[in-house]
Amino acid sequence: MNILIANDDGVFAPGIQALAHALKPLGRVVIVAPESERSGYSSALTLDRPLRPIQISEDVWAVNGTPADCVYLSMNGLFDFEFDLVVSGINSGANLGDDVLYSGTVGAAFEGRLMKQPAIAVSLAGSNVRSYEHAHDYAVAAKWVHDFIQKGLPNLPPRHILNINIPDVAALKGERVTYQGLRAQSKPITSHVDPRGRQVYWIGLAGEAVTDPKKTSSHIQSDFFAVANGYVSITPIQMDATNYDILEDLQTYIG
């Protein structure tokens, strides 16, 4: 099996290094990742300048582009063989709820699925994760991904991926199939004056989880709930954002 690994934290991030090490027993593992952090790039492709893949070492490549660029190049001519699976991650920080709209980790996985291959996005969720600098900090999560893939991935419909969030705990309680939760509105922007006297702004941090009262009665819980309780969250998500429930009503309204 040929496995392509991408991320949005950059080619030297500890999460992707841990993941590559864990998956090598499953087949050939190739890392193609941004040369520096590209968080928040979603599924963006670079169309205004050429991309420059550089081989760092055997089966490790850095690209001066986005996470989706890395997958697109890898599956459209950068290599003389085909990939069987795309794994994006392990992201430094959660991609829960509305995070998937912005996530480069999820964007890379979607790009792989557009290329007709199975794809999963994997993130490590926890308050201390962003300070981790070593691959061993991701060892528990990486082993879980290895075991999950080794068991055989479920067959998903076209244009669907699995968004997986692994809590940063010493002992995982198990897995839960989840729905995509909701976040409260992001915290306000912060304004400062830089050393040259110019007004600059920082976008606020993501909001907290919001409970959806319509779904609390279901035995399927949100991704937020699963992770907060020590379970791996496995959420099937799709590229088609059409709300089919209101199509007929909207057609009637429009006339």
UniProtKB/Swiss-Prot annotation:
Cofactor note: Binds 1 divalent metal cation per subunit.
Source species, domain of life: Bacteria
Recorded name of the encoding gene: surE
InterPro entries named in the record: SurE, SurE-like_Pase/nucleotidase, SurE-like_sf
Keyword annotations: Cytoplasm, Hydrolase, Metal-binding, Nucleotide-binding
Reported function: Nucleotidase that shows phosphatase activity on nucleoside 5'-monophosphates.
Species this protein is from: Acinetobacter baylyi (strain ATCC 33305 / BD413 / ADP1)
Record EC number: 3.1.3.5
Family: Belongs to the SurE nucleotidase family.
Keyword Flavoprotein part of the UniProt annotation: no
Protein's recorded name: 5'-nucleotidase SurE
Location in or out of the cell: Cytoplasm
Entry GO terms, CC: cytoplasm
GO MF terms, alphabetically ordered: 3'-nucleotidase activity; 5'-nucleotidase activity; exopolyphosphatase activity; metal ion binding; nucleotide binding
Binding site for a divalent metal cation: 8-9, 39, 91
Reactions performed catalytically: a ribonucleoside 5'-phosphate + H2O = a ribonucleoside + phosphate
Cofactor(s) of this protein: a divalent metal cation
One Pfam family named in its UniProt record: SurE
This protein's record includes keyword Hydrolase: yes
